[in-house]
Amino acid sequence: MSEKVDWLQSQNGVCKVDVYSPGDNQAQDWKMDTSTDPVRVLSWLRRDLEKSTAEFQDVRFKPGESFGGETSNSGDPHKGFSVDYYNTTTKGTPERLHFEMTHKEIPCQGPRAQLGNGSSVDEVSFYANRLTNLVIAMARKEINEKIDGSENKCVYQSLYMGNEPTPTKSLSKIASELVNETVSACSRNAAPDKAPGSGDRVSGSSQSPPNLKYKSTLKIKESTKERQGPDDKPPSKKSFFYKEVFESRNGDYAREGGRFFPRERKRFRGQERPDDFTASVSEGIMTYANSVVSDMMVSIMKTLKIQVKDTTIATILLKKVLLKHAKEVVSDLIDSFLRNLHSVTGTLMTDTQFVSAVKRTVFSHGSQKATDIMDAMLRKLYNVMFAKKVPEHVRKAQDKAESYSLISMKGMGDPKNRNVNFAMKSETKLREKMYSEPKSEEETCAKTLGEHIIKEGLTLWHKTQQKECKSLGFQHAAFEAPNTQRKPASDISFEYPEDIGNLSLPPYPPEKPENFMYDSDSWAEDLIVSALLLIQYHLAQGGRRDARSFVEAAGTTNFPANEPPVAPDESCLKSAPIVGDQEQAEKKDLRSVFFNFIRNLLSETIFKRDQSPEPKVPEQPVKEDRKLCERPLASSPPRLYEDDETPGALSGLTKMAVSQIDGHMSGQMVEHLMNSVMKLCVIIAKSCDASLAELGDDKSGDASRLTSAFPDSLYECLPAKGTGSAEAVLQNAYQAIHNEMRGTSGQPPEGCAAPTVIVSNHNLTDTVQNKQLQAVLQWVAASELNVPILYFAGDDEGIQEKLLQLSAAAVDKGCSVGEVLQSVLRYEKERQLNEAVGNVTPLQLLDWLMVNL
């Protein structure tokens, strides 16, 4: 959108809004700017993890249904439990998870159940569950110890079941306790009080309570030994005791009327049995579990390598543990280093000669380093200021590089290094701009059309000269005067060169006709100038006269007698008509026509010859030509050139002194003329429908026209096919312009699907009001750009649903972009007025627009 848009008065209709839902086989190619803030990155990762978990649950379990898994051992029918998992992610946020575990008692099939071959498996699973609980308890003990610094603390964990409400917990707590709760419940159901084979494990179902609450307690005791010597530190020995507490459901509640009411709770604590558990799990296993948990936490934090500022519980715990360990290790290291240094250098520091020698050495090294630094700085300053001058485009790009570096430095943790990094990034950007090779320019519409015009024109003239050479022959060619036009040999090919501005004239002796060649520069100028003036003629006449009539009128134009003389070696001189070639005489000598156009253009052109080595193209003449095309002009033909008068088509052009043009036109002039042709062609293609609307249906008989968003009157600017060679060149040029402009008309090329516009906003810390305003402005901008449907992805505030309803209502009512923006401004004024008075706005932006739009 290069042109200015009056948003408040825009009459474009609003587009529809939909939720983006990619297919199963559709790849998502997201392109977005990632933030350098670690808090946002961690938040995004956590949200992605929650979404992935929800998708996995949706695949395995259907919404609203439960998954019950019953496991029972054929050898031991007493054990059996089922896990019911209710998927409620589609109804609420991922934090609202319901996890329920039930216990089923399978009655005995015989009077006594034998363990048989399954006793060994039960024993292994029993101790594995106990060991897992121990590792988890040890990890929690160490984390709490590192945070609070308490040595004697009891880690208490309980799992509530049944009809008791689950306490409100965050998702991170639920994730961290999920494994422990599951293992605890399994060990409770699988192993009631003792290990298998202990004598009282195998009993009837009446001996074990039907509903139990499981609690695990970790106690730490310290025992201090007596000191053996005066310098010995008091050694401390920690003993770990692990026991399980069972609570009977029948003892806690009394059943009254089919409901459970809480009563005085009684806890049944079993005595510590060192022969049962603590004797089987040795002290080495507990120490190993403790070291494994510590190493695991350290390795996780080393892998992450981030600075955590989030309030997540797990990250805070790990950070504090690491900080405390690091402080202790660094403190011990510094103390030992200083003690060793003092013991070694204690005697040397008292020696004055040694101290003076050390000072001299340090001073000499420091002076040398300072000298090197100053030399480097001065050399850099000299190179920047005197040796290598920075080009103009690099100086313009320097501000952009500095602003980019400043933006990229936001979010850095250490503010002290900000200036250093900023200078390094700016210097790197500047060096890349200075020493990098210039990028190749993209193929623009002007370059494409200019190449096409010159190539077609050179091919046309080559064919014409081949016919002349065959009919006349070189033996009849005579050079009568210095102004006689030279003719090329039949074996010369005028293929279009790669660089238009660097066309050069090969040396040739004028006395040998077989070595004669046309100057490619002049032929390029002839063709471009002819196309330029023909297009200007169409602009002036509004397409009401044929291009051939203008060619014939220009061929009989009388020029003033006081024109400056032309150098004899110029290859675009006027040639006398060839006698004997009746066909060429009937069609007029186009070379003389081109020459006349050039001579006239030297006095009237749209470009000024500046004194700078690189002339710049002004934009004002283009605007004048645009106005000339937009308003309907008089249909009377322009006056022919008489004396010093200029034609009506060139009346608004800028004067240029003829003395500034020498005999041979430079490549820069060729480039300027080519740009003028292109700008006028673009003007015609965009805005020639104002004065040609009446001719749109009369002369539109060409069936080969392409259907596009352009009006039919555009083709009235095109001359009829086959009316002349110059008209054929213009026909091809207009067609190239038309094809080029199709890409910007809003319609995709044939065979290509329309692009899909998807908006994904990630404003985690922004308010709901700002998010709604951002979504509305994105919708309005897409409507102004004629986007059919705007898709939104990644919404958690309910904005999508409201915006869908608003867009559907606006489309039904036929609202425009200007009406929507005016409504938004009214809402903002009301909201600011309410805030100034102290009132609260009752409705949000989307709700207010639904009511008042």
Curated annotation (Swiss-Prot):
Annotated region described as Disordered, given as residue ranges: 188-240
UniProt note on tissues of expression: Testis specific; only expressed in spermatids.
Biased composition (Basic and acidic residues): 219-235
Protein name (database record): A-kinase anchor protein 3
InterPro entries: AKAP_110, AKAP_110_C, SPHK1-interactor_AKAP_110
Modified residues (Phosphoserine): S205, S208, S403, S635, S636
Phenotypic consequence of C15Y: In SPGF82; uncertain significance; decreased expression in homozygous patient spermatozoa
Disorder this protein is connected to according to its UniProt record: Spermatogenic failure 82: An autosomal recessive male infertility disorder characterized by asthenoteratozoospermia and multiple morphologic abnormalities of the sperm flagella.
Gene: AKAP3
Pfam families listed in its UniProt record: AKAP_110 (PF05716)
Impact upon substituting L131P: Abolishes interaction with ROPN1
Source organism of this protein record: Homo sapiens (Human)
GO biological process, any: flagellated sperm motility
